Structures are given as structure tokens and as C-alpha cells.
Amino acid sequence: MSNKVIGDVILDVKNISLRFGGVKALTDISFNVKEHEIRSIIGPNGAGKSSMLNCINGVYTPSEGSITFRGKTFDHMNSRQVAEMGIARTFQNLALFKGMSVIDNIMSGRNLKIKSNLFLQALRVGPAQREEEAHREKVEHIIDFLEIQAFRKTPVGQLPYGLQKRVDLGRALAMEPQVLLLDEPMAGMNLEEKQDMCRFILDVNDEFGTTIVLIEHDMGVVMDISDRVVVLDYGKKIGDGEPEEVRNNEDVIRAYLGTSH
């Protein structure tokens, strides 16, 4: 990993609990994320990892607790409001527009950045045309960065799974997030695809300066690229620290590392 400088806390999760009826998905979870770091969340299936991301990006409203991003505390924000604050997310199950091209899928991530009205956008004249050209320039940069130039006009549904994952990452990057939430970005990939995605994640963190919160089942990946790791089990936090510290935590070994998850 590069000699990057980790900044101050920009995302602070405090005492988050989440209930679905009588089922408690998360219980009193607290952790923070520092600027420019890669912060991983691990745990067995059903540990509450995706539920935690859903609370951060406004899909779920926590039953208790609060989340503070750059000094602003929120507990009742929808996904769009969270995105406008500068938090973007990819999902474990791809939600791409399969019939649309790669470039149009990534362009859809620019929606929050569009300032001209719909009428001017449709006419593509004056400021609207210049704005669209600027957005397309940003998107082309992302396409080059992710090494998918050859597929710019290809419908996403025709691409191999690993390339679709890159497009999903590209769409999130098009939002220019300060914090990027990645929900199992390497799920279903072969070794070569995982190595490529690891490289892209590290480069996003290093070159774009984007803070990353990562859920990933591949423990080798987590330990190699993370600055700090928080561990969940049955909706509770059982470990938190640097990778080596977590690797040697007895509770973590029993709950996760010592199992076949």
C-alpha cells in the first residue's frame, strides 16, 4: 500500500441498533471511518454487514443511534439525500441498466451533478450542451481509469460479470463521492478478476483520494488492502482494529476466521 496520510474521522457511527419487528439485525454498533482510509466490515453470513451499509446510505432508518458525516448528524435521511452529501454505494447484486451501454450506465451516476433544467438538456443547447460535454469528459476519464474503453458502447448485459462489476464501480465513481461504500465488490469473481478489482480499489483510494468502506468475504483481500477492520457477528461488534490485531483476536477467530464462511 502507498504511504498515504490518514486524516481525521469523517464518518462516525454511534450506537446503531436496527430491528425488523421482533428481530434485532444490529445491536449497539459503534465505529468510525477516517478520511482516505480503507475501512472493511467483515463477519459471517447474516452478521449484519449489508444492514450496516443500508443504515449508512439511507436505505434503512436505524431504530436507535446516529450517524455523523463531516459534522452533520443524521438518522432519517433517504438514499438521495445521503448521496448528495457525498456518500455513494455499489451493491452486491448488480442493479445496472442491462440494455444500456457502458457509457450511458456510468453517465447515470452524474444525475446528481446536473444543474441545467430538463428542457435545456433535451435541446442540448448553450449551457446545457457545455454541461453535458463536461459530464461526458468525467465519464470518459473513469472509463479509461477502469480500462473498459473497448466496451464503451456495448450493452452492459452483454459483458462478462467481472466487467459489469467495473461498470458498477464506475457509476459510483461518477458521483464523485467522498466516501464509497462497496458491498462485496469481488463476489463471484475469479482470481484474475479479483486481482484487477483490488488494484482498482487501491487506485481509487490513492489517486481519487476517496475514503472506502468495504464489505468483502475474501479474507486475504481484506487483510491485504484494509487500514482498519471492524468485525460483526449476529449483529454485534466483536472486533475492531488494524488487520493484524483483528487476525489475532480470539473472538474473531472463533466467530469468523476459524469457520468456513
List each language-model region with its residue ranges.
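Glycine-rich phosphate-binding loops of nucleotide-dependent enzymes
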Residues: 2-261
